[in-house]
């Protein structure tokens, strides 16, 4: 969980353990889209791990064949769905000055691109490298793991514990913070600071963050290409799922039964993929009880940092465990609100609905 938080993703709320006895059982849920392969299940029949279906679920009508969409691979740049009005072309050359409103509502004016950036945020590091401006990053924090090219960037703290002296020694002309704890100390040391809080309410805003950094560093053309690609891939997913009402129930374990609920980017992902979060009454992140998980019996489990549930006798009768429907992501893409976030959505979509997202 610590790694998840420090990567600049949603920040967990204080630990609250709901009592299972006080929670009403959820209503029965519709099944996943019928265009995915149907499975016949008895109580202890093993289903395909990539396609769990609750046995008691009703099946919605399939959409008209002409609406079927083939989802692209993460590497594809030409997308199957393009229904939005075209965005005006980005300027061919950078335009300065650039004014940015920071997290405190203050205007920060850039008369020229910063050359030496301490990017104390995983998402910003990924954005700068994605738009071809990674050589401007001269410092970051210890939890940055992507892209591999960033491994050689000096570390000046552990996400929430910045070494101000080490930061000053790097002689940056801009320090970016996703929280403002060290802002005054850095400014007293004569450094320019841009504070903007981590995205936590809408992953669609990632594209605008990418464009913002393109303006700041004077590379709007590359930023527009990356941002548009992000938006088109999200559009493909949302359009593919638009004709369906509900899929399987889901529990996401961020470690020690901490789980995301309302007001998180992960809940937004669940909404797009029509997954029914068993932690529907959680706000932010909370640690829930084993009893509540057993009571709500998820059809799918996402084990963000390794599967510690399947081998636990407490959870042996869960539908997801019996069907071997426990998904361990191959990366931390869904933990960081940067360009890779859409890859995390695509990977989860292919695992849950292989018939829709081949």
Question: What are these model-derived regions, one by one?
Answer:
Residues 1-5:
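Sec-dependent bacterial lipoprotein signal peptides
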Residues 102-105, 154-165, 180, 282-291:
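Short helix-initiation/N-cap motifs at beta->coil->alpha
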Residues 162-171, 189, 288-297:
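Short helices/loops that flank or line small-molecule/ion binding pockets
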